[in-house]
């Protein structure tokens, strides 16, 4: 791609981003990202979060999802969050900066969870996108498989899993895998998710024993 094409593409993205009504609302409300609205839509539909819950937030930065969940679980709840990128502190959120693909980071995250009964694991993780689906989709699928592995390790029976997945090769198999582990599984495309994006959110509730 030439510099001129890249510049035109970047300009279009910036124009779309700043004219996006959810970006504008997020700025007005002082929210960390437009992702707040995606999780709010999921909560309105599926009633995932309740006061006092312990929640694991993967791919947490800049903090939109954690910021939302704090309002739902209250002071008695707890969020253990992780991201490769830094995140400004949020009261009630225990943040670990590191690469979730790294075994040592995974171990440190499990240590922070400790003996807590985790009621929700949520993942908004995504790889750096190259724009080539043949490269991007396998990278994204690897991350969501790791998130599901975290569910197997820490999620309490009856717990819930919310995960961003990009539709493409491996999606159907992944969905079948989740259906085998949870009693109820929905695929959501929130209004606040950009229409041209391949992303959808799998909302799985009732982890089987």
Swiss-Prot record:
The gene is rlmE. Its main location: cytoplasm. It catalyses: uridine(2552) in 23S rRNA + S-adenosyl-L-methionine = 2'-O-methyluridine(2552) in 23S rRNA + S-adenosyl-L-homocysteine + H(+). This is Ribosomal RNA large subunit methyltransferase E. It holds the Pfam family FtsJ. Transmembrane segments: none annotated. One of its GO terms (cellular component) is cytoplasm. Its EC number is 2.1.1.166. InterPro entries: RNA_methyltr_RlmE, RNA_MeTrfase_FtsJ_dom, rRNA-MeTfrase_E, rRNA_MeTrfase_gammaproteobac, SAM-dependent_MTases_sf. The keyword S-adenosyl-L-methionine applies. One of its GO terms (molecular function) is rRNA (uridine-2'-O-)-methyltransferase activity. Specifically methylates the uridine in position 2552 of 23S rRNA at the 2'-O position of the ribose in the fully assembled 50S ribosomal subunit. It comes from Cronobacter sakazakii (strain ATCC BAA-894) (Enterobacter sakazakii). Belongs to the class I-like SAM-binding methyltransferase superfamily. RNA methyltransferase RlmE family. It comes from the Bacteria. It is found in: Cytoplasm. CDD domains: AdoMet_MTases.
């Amino acid at each position: 791609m030439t510099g001129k094409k890249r510049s035109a593409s970047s300009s279009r993205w910036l124009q779309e981003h700043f004219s996006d009504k959810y970006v504008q609302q997020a700025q007005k409300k002082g929210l960390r990202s437009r992702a707040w609205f995606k999780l709010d839509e999921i909560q309105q539909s599926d009633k995932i979060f309740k006061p006092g819950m312990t929640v694991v937030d993967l791919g947490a930065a800049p903090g939109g999802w954690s910021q939302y969940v704090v309002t739902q679980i209250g002071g008695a709840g707890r969020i253990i969050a992780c991201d490769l990128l830094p995140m400004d502190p949020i009261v009630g959120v225990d943040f670990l900066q590191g690469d979730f693909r790294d075994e040592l980071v995974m171990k440190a995250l499990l240590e922070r969870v400790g003996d807590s009964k985790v009621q929700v694991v949520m993942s908004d993780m995504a790889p750096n996108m190259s724009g080539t689906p043949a490269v991007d989709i396998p990278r994204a699928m690897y991350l969501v498989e790791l998130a599901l592995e975290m569910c197997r390790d820490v999620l309490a029976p009856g717990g819930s899993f919310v995960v961003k997945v990009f539709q493409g090769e491996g999606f159907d198999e992944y969905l079948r895998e989740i259906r085998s582990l949870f009693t109820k599984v929905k695929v959501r495309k929130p209004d606040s998710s950009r229409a041209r994006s391949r992303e959808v959110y799998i909302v799985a509730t009732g982890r089987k024993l």
